[in-house]
Swiss-Prot record:
Catalyzes the decarboxylation of L-aspartate, 3-sulfino-L-alanine (cysteine sulfinic acid), and L-cysteate to beta-alanine, hypotaurine and taurine, respectively. The preferred substrate is 3-sulfino-L-alanine. Does not exhibit any decarboxylation activity toward glutamate. Its EC number is 4.1.1.29, 4.1.1.11. The gene is Csad. Belongs to the group II decarboxylase family. The keyword Lyase applies. Expressed in brain, liver and kidney. This is Cysteine sulfinic acid decarboxylase.
Length: 493
């Protein structure tokens, strides 16, 4: 039968290719979308690694398989994967499945182009420029530059590299030999990519000076001043401050205006890592959390997080208008960036980045924005804040739940205190025993498949849960389920 032929025979057979893809898309709609976003279905189907290897039959063979077997494999891959679009997936800073963004991702994959020249990606070169222009306008810049990067970590690393190049342009050719000992500054609550970036760029992790944060996780500008003076006294040259708008755990927003004042006094590049909190700029009600961001030199913003644009969608935005990106990263590869092309070669943006091939990440955001409009996206942000407030009030009502602190963003950090520990906060082993609760409950919920929520210690604080209210399809019933499920899972502890 034709259906039993190995998949390789589909080459050159458009009818068979179309039939296969229709079946695959049917599986995607049924399993990943319909079931994957249904609260009555499991978030995950947990299996131990060895069992999962056996179930998936991962080993690659010399012979191709039948169409039916390939479809079974597609179904299995989805079945055993975590459903991040599920309304009870609270584990990461991204969640949800926007249908228009997904449509954009499907088109992107189908066209399979690279965003480096206008000749092979004309639609997306123009589209990226327009999307970046809109994002910059929300930051508060009428002009500037930018690029989509493969994740917020890379955006942060770009900012470090650009700040270094601006101060010491000879480093592009001469490398570290052209540099004195450099110092960059960031809060102890920053994303770990800042330290990784310093190591990756050859500055070394010792070049990262950690600035104190207050009890809410916000950088203390006075300590930033102190750290700058200390670095200078030790013979280092300060060149960059990385502030955070929306820290990973507590959801804190650094005081950008005060930090910008410090940077202005010392002539330092100000980068704002708004990968998590940048989308708040869309909300007229809450954008005050990022007051002062327009004074930054660069901003990292991940629409794949709170806007649910889908992985990956990460923008690096620059206030610079001097073509700094291209001057820093360009290498003028003659087989790509010929200067005698028949169109305006300024549209060939590929020399701005350190990559050659670059994925198209603008379409999903553009299509979602076209469908929702700025007003629809603003509602999405405001709704997340409203549900956060609902969760906070419910936590305060329920026995056995305790807030770590009042949130200012959509990160809600709290403890579940099981029956055996209630009223025993003064016991010497209370914190140690409380720290054991979250890992046990996490294992139980994952193996049961009912929900996923992250936990972590923080400083001297015992392990606590970090609830992220980000999925646009969340409703109050999902919040109620979260709290009720923790009570059910922890009633015997």
């Amino acid at each position: 039968m034709a259906d039993s032929k190995p998949l390789r025979t589909l080459d050159g057979d458009p009818v068979a290719v179309e039939a296969l893809l229709r079946d695959v898309f049917g599986i995607v709609v049924d399993e990943a979308i319909r079931k994957g976003t249904n609260a009555s279905e499991k978030v995950c189907e947990w299996k131990e690694p060895e069992e999962l290897k056996q179930l998936l039959d991962l080993e690659l063979q010399s012979q191709g398989e039948s169409r039916e077997r390939i479809l079974e494999r597609c179904r299995a891959v989805i079945h055993y994967s975590v459903k991040t679009g599920h309304p009870r997936f609270f584990n990461q800073l991204f969640s949800g499945l926007d249908p228009h963004a997904l449509a954009g991702r499907i088109i992107t994959e189908s066209l399979n182009t690279s965003q480096y020249t206008y000749e092979i990606a004309p639609v997306f070169v123009l589209m990226e420029e327009e999307v970046l222009k809109k994002l910059r306008a929300l930051v508060g810049w009428n002009t500037g530059d930018g690029v989509f990067c493969p994740g917020g970590s890379i955006s942060n690393m770009y900012a470090i590299n650009l700040a270094r190049f601006q101060r010491y342009p000879d480093c592009k050719q001469r490398g570290l030999r052209a540099l004195p000992p450099l110092a960059l500054f960031t809060s102890k609550e920053c994303h770990y990519s800042i330290t990784k970036g310093a190591a990756f760029l050859g500055l070394g992790t010792d070049s990262v000076r950690v600035v104190k944060a207050d009890e809410r996780g916000k950088m203390i500008p006075e300590d930033l001043e102190r750290q700058i003076s200390l670095a200078e006294a030790e013979g280092s040259v300060p060149f960059l401050v990385s502030a955070t708008s929306g820290t990973t755990v507590l959801g804190a927003f650094d005081p950008l205006d005060a930090i910008a004042d410090v940077c202005q006094r010392h002539g330092l590049w100000l980068h704002v890592d708004a990968a998590w909190g940048g989308s708040v700029l869309l909300s007229r009600t809450h954008r005050h959390l990022l007051d002062g961001i327009q004074r930054a030199d660069s901003v990292a913003w991940n629409p794949h997080k709170l806007l649910a644009a889908g992985l990956q969608c990460s923008a690096l935005l620059l206030r610079d208008t001097s073509n700094l990106l291209k001057r820093c990263h360009g290498s003028q590869a003659s087989y790509l960036f010929q200067q005698d092309k028949f169109y305006n070669v300024a549209l060939d943006t590929g020399d701005k980045v350190v990559q050659c091939g670059r994925r198209v990440d603008c379409l999903k955001l553009w299509l979602m924005w076209k469908a929702q409009g700025g007003q629809g996206l603003e509602w999405r942000i405001d709704q997340a804040f409203a549900l956060t407030r609902y969760l906070v009030e419910e936590i305060k009502k329920r026995e056995g739940f305790e807030l770590v602190m009042e949130p200012e963003f959509v990160n809600v950090c709290f403890w579940f205190v099981p029956p055996s520990l209630r009223g025993k906060k003064e016991s010497p082993d209370y914190s140690q025993r409380l720290s054991q609760v979250a890992p046990v409950l996490k294992e139980r919920m994952v193996k049961k498949g009912t929900m996923m929520i992250g936990y972590q210690p923080h400083g001297t604080r015992a392990n606590f849960f970090r609830m992220v209210v980000a999925n646009p399809i969340l409703v109050q019933a999902d919040i109620d389920f979260l709290l009720g499920e923790l009570e059910r899972l922890g009633q015997d502890l």
